[in-house]
């Protein structure tokens, strides 16, 4: 018989089949037909550890393998193992939906004997090599017989997963699962919870939700404070650059505004002068001459001003000479 893969301890087994660890010489598998491998167990809360152990049994031999899986009924299991979560029919049905299983044997015996092997034409029994205490009192190890006759096929366990571990997770978070089911419409009677415990659980859940909301708000406030700090640091780092840019733009605008004001004043002065000349009867030529004189005055050089100064001095000297000569004649 091949490895027993659904274990009675409800622990999962790994998928790679290992060499036999039994001291007896292992019998040779048949070559004219598929090898019939048997695996048994409780398979409560069927999980991937169970599936991997069944995969090991199915792939224990290179040729075609026919895998039979035995599952103990509720009476036998409760007597030697303890209470299960799933009923026997639920456990049988879980096994039937595993792709590695060819046949499910319900009401399997707690200890495999020669009569059972002959009845189902079993070649090998598959299970891990660790001794499994026989609580029925028939022997020290449930698989002691098949190991002695060389019809035991060893498998490896899958660490980290077992039915007991799953139950422990549920027990650990029992209150949360109770509240979840109460919120989904289950009554406290369905869950076996007293009135006082139900109220206490609801109060605790409200307090927990309040704590979660407070924590969420604190995180949001912290994020906003961090954002403000980042913006402040960015403003401080770029303040000088922003101020310099503003002053440059402001100075350029003031220069343009000053130029526009000067041009406007000059234009108004020219218009006013032109209007005065027209009132005095001067023609357009005189007006043009005024423009020329105006621009010449604005754009004239210092040399032109010097020439005008010397001309005026010469005129004054001539007038002085004339006055002196006139006075001399009068004295004569």
Swiss-Prot record:
Q: Which GO terms describe its molecular function?
A: choline-phosphate cytidylyltransferase activity
Q: Which Pfam families would you find in this protein's record?
A: CTP_transf_like (PF01467)
From what superkingdom does this record's organism come?
A: Eukaryota
Q: Which GO terms describe its biological process?
A: phosphatidylcholine biosynthetic process
Q: Where is this region: Disordered?
A: 1-32, 276-332
UniProt catalytic activity: phosphocholine + CTP + H(+) = CDP-choline + diphosphate
| Keywords on record | Acetylation, Lipid biosynthesis, Lipid metabolism, Nucleotidyltransferase, Phospholipid biosynthesis, Phospholipid metabolism, Transferase
Deletion phenotype: No visible phenotype under normal growth conditions.
Its EC number(s): 2.7.7.15
Report the InterPro entries cross-referenced here: CCT, Cyt_trans-like, Pcy1-like, Rossmann-like_a/b/a_fold
- Biased segments, Basic and acidic residues type: 319-332
Q: Which residues bind CTP?
A: 42-50, 81, 127-128, 132, 157-161
Enzyme class comes to transferase
This protein's pathway reads: Phospholipid metabolism; phosphatidylcholine biosynthesis; phosphatidylcholine from phosphocholine: step 1/2
Q: Which residues bind substrate?
A: 81, 110
Q: Does the keyword Transferase apply?
A: yes
Q: Which residues carry this modification: N-acetylserine?
A: 2
Does the record's keyword annotation contain Ribosomal protein?
no
Thermoactivity: Optimum temperature is 30 degrees Celsius.
Q: What does this protein do?
A: Plays an important role in the biosynthesis of the phospholipid phosphatidylcholine. Catalyzes the formation of CDP-choline.
Regarding protein family, the annotation reads: Belongs to the cytidylyltransferase family.
Any idea what this protein is called?
A: Choline-phosphate cytidylyltransferase 1
Provenance organism:
Arabidopsis thaliana
Q: What is the lineage of its organism?
A: Eukaryota, Viridiplantae, Streptophyta, Embryophyta, Tracheophyta
Originating gene: CCT1
